Amino acid sequence: MKKILLILLLLFLIPLSACGKVKYEFKDGVMYEDGKEATGTFEVTINGFKSKGKFINGLANEIEVYYSDGSIMRKDIYVNGEFLGLQVYYRNGKLMSTYLKDKRMDIFYDDGQLLMRFDKEKGENTVYFENGNPLLVIVGTTTSTLYNENKEVLSRIENGIRLDDDITFKNLEDGSFEIIKNNKVIGKISAYGVPTYFYSTGETLMKLDNSVYKTLFKNGNTFFERDGNITRFYYKDGKLLYESKGKEWTIYNREGEKIITAFDEITDIKKID
């Protein structure tokens, strides 16, 4: 009789244990629990970083991503499950980037100074010097203006035509030209027609290097570069900060880790509440 009771008990326990494991899945922006839209607080791994998010009926309500020391790296903003934007932070707590869906994206230096703003509504992209002055302003696909750190215009192009009436050129013996404005050399054009522009103090600001347009920090390291549809921004020490290729883009921390991409990888899902 005891053996029969033991067998019956095992028969009940086996299906219970088999049913005890819940399957969680994040697919197409929706969190599922055993195939149904989930509600609760979840711990997940996003692009390799520990994260926590709240979901209601499968849709995200808020998501936070953390550095290894527990400090906040990123906050995703949602309203009624719709993704509206995000904020990314440096380890020191300063804002690194903000993104408002279909409106604007900003990237900041680690001291809080604005580095780049892409205004989708205006169709305007502006890159800034560390002192806050504009370095390059691009409007649509037709107009671009390059400045030095003192906000003096070095070059203005509209519809492929230079609009620099106050600029003169001095022919040098090697076939190159000095670009002169207000009796000061602001740049140079090589004998092959390749332009280079200078800071007000003489260091190279912008140059064309093997068909890649590069803007440099005063220390000579690349600040940002553009090669066709590929754009890259760098930290002052030369490490990659931001990269975009068409609709794909990635932001990196100083350790070279991808901390945010256009397509997040979410794994290790665990419900905690």
How would you describe each model-predicted region?
Residues 17-273:
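Glycine/tyrosine- and acidic-biased, solvent-exposed loop/turn segments at the edges of beta-strands
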Residues 4-15:
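Sec-dependent N-terminal signal peptides
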